[in-house]
């Protein structure tokens, strides 16, 4: 049976949680393969209950699904325990959550350094969430990180923390004029937190591969989006991991030949949180309309999202970079009540037309959108359950996005609820 990768095709916040939730009843496993609690998924159940998840996979809300925090994720122990407690309080069964022994832990010193670094950079800041994600990945690549399995051996944990703080305390005290952290206090805090999740630690790469061999279906759930990928995104305004499909194999331990479907999630317009280039960004009443109607506030940060028209250049780019086979188009309903809807089909960069993503960072910053306009619609589309039930102009808009993006739009979101979805083609195949 298949391994399906779910990818954000823009700058994150595309509605990946809704897609996971929709597929949940047909999945046996849902896996987070990268990132940390610097991104959020919102899921609205048929009864109206709304859940905001930051670290735990969205499949936790579907009974019978085993959820995995994979080796490519960086885990804040406190956030994990808080999120689990919140789900438990609301009656959600969290017993089927596993934690890769090889995932890295976000330590208190990662958070401290992240926050003071952003403040120090001031206007030149990248716009991180200040949750220690980047510093944790830095330690991982420098081979000095603390892994989940280290909480099972206090001696190893202590050695790693002492070695890390020998250098990081120098940075905190001498560069940023902050207090030094006590190694033993850090160790004690982490071990106390570990008591709440040690029973979940597992060899998840083995379990996932055995599940596929048994014919079970696995969904690999990315956080953030393609344009935030550290290699393929709008560098340096990116995250510290690989949300793209290549990261799914690395961050889960599933071989790439096991992946049968790459489902890209596209918002019917474009949003971005934080700093960085955004060619179709709107600063007028249209931008305000999209932000207000779409409820564009970051789940994790609470920051207002920047809004703009649909950008087909980055959609085509995402299709190629990820090998996307299908798209789930979300928030089409937000565009109702617009007379015309512009679509960015290319960029003007200093007088030269670009139909594909510019190679250089400078060109991306200089890019001005080239628009074509589509007629809008005024009908309420939230009750449409087949493509044919959409207004003709809405159908034409979807078909044009499909043509420009280069992959079939299999699902269309017409509202926030799980049932407010049109399925044109089954993505579980």
UniProtKB/Swiss-Prot annotation:
What are the leading ranks of the lineage? Bacteria, Bacillati, Actinomycetota, Actinomycetes, Mycobacteriales
Q: What is this protein called?
A: Adenylosuccinate synthetase
Q: Extract one GO BP annotation from the record.
A: IMP metabolic process
Q: Which residues form the active site?
A: 13 (proton acceptor), 41 (proton donor)
Q: What organism is the protein native to? A: Rhodococcus opacus (strain B4)
Task: Please name the gene that encodes this protein.
Answer: purA
As recorded in UniProt, its EC number(s) are 6.3.4.4
Residue positions binding IMP: 13-16, 38-41, 129, 143, 224, 239, 303
Which PROSITE patterns did the record assign? ADENYLOSUCCIN_SYN_1, ADENYLOSUCCIN_SYN_2
UniProt: GTP binding residues: 12-18, 40-42, 305, 331-333, 413-415
Tell me, in one coarse class, where this protein mainly resides. Answer: cytoplasm
């Amino acid at each position: 049976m298949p391994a399906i990768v779910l990818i954000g095709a823009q700058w994150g916040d595309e509605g990946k949680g809704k897609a996971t939730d929709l597929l949940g009843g047909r999945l046996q496993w849902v896996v987070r393969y990268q990132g940390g609690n610097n991104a959020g998924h919102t899921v609205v159940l048929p009864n109206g209950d709304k859940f905001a998840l930051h670290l735990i996979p969205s499949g936790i809300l579907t009974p019978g699904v085993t959820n995995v925090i994979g080796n490519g994720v960086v885990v804040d122990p406190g956030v994990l325990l808080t999120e689990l407690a919140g789900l438990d309080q609301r009656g959600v069964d969290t017993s089927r959550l596993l934690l890769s022994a090889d995932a890295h832990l976000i330590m208190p010193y990662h958070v401290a350094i992240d926050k003071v670094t952003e403040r120090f950079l001031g206007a030149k800041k990248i716009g991180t969430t200040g949750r220690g994600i980047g510093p944790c990945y830095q330690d991982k690549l420098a081979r000095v990180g603390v892994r989940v399995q280290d909480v099972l051996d206090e001696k190893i944990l202590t050695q790693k923390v002492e070695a890390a703080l020998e250098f990081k305390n120098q940075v905190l005290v001498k560069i940023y004029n902050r207090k030094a952290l006590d190694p033993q206090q850090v160790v004690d805090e982490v071990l106390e937190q570990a008591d709440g999740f040690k029973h979940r630690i597992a060899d998840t790469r083995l379990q996932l591969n055995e599940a596929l061999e048994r014919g079970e279906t696995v969904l690999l759930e990315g956080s953030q989006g393609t344009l935030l990928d550290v290699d393929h995104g709008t560098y340096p305004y990116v995250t510290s991991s690989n949300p793209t499909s290549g990261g799914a194999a690395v961050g889960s331990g599933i071989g790439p030949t096991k992946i049968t479907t790459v489902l890209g999630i596209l918002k019917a317009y474009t949003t971005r949180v934080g700093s960085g280039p955004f060619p179709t960004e709107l600063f007028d009443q249209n931008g305000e309309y999209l932000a207000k109607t779409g409820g564009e506030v970051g789940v994790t940060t609470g920051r207002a999202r920047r809004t703009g028209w649909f950008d087909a250049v980055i959609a085509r780019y995402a299709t190629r970079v990820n090998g996307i086979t299908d798209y789930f188009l979300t928030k089409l309903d937000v565009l109702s009540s617009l007379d015309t809807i512009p679509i960015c089909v290319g960029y003007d960069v200093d007088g030269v037309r670009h139909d594909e993503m510019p190679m250089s960072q400078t060109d991306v910053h200089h890019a001005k959108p080239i628009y074509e306009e589509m007629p809008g619609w005024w009908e309420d589309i939230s009750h449409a359950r087949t493509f044919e039930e959409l207004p003709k102009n809405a159908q034409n808009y979807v078909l044009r996005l499909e043509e420009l993006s280069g992959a079939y739009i299999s699902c269309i979101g017409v509202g926030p609820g799980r049932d407010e979805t049109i399925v044109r083609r089954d993505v579980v195949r």
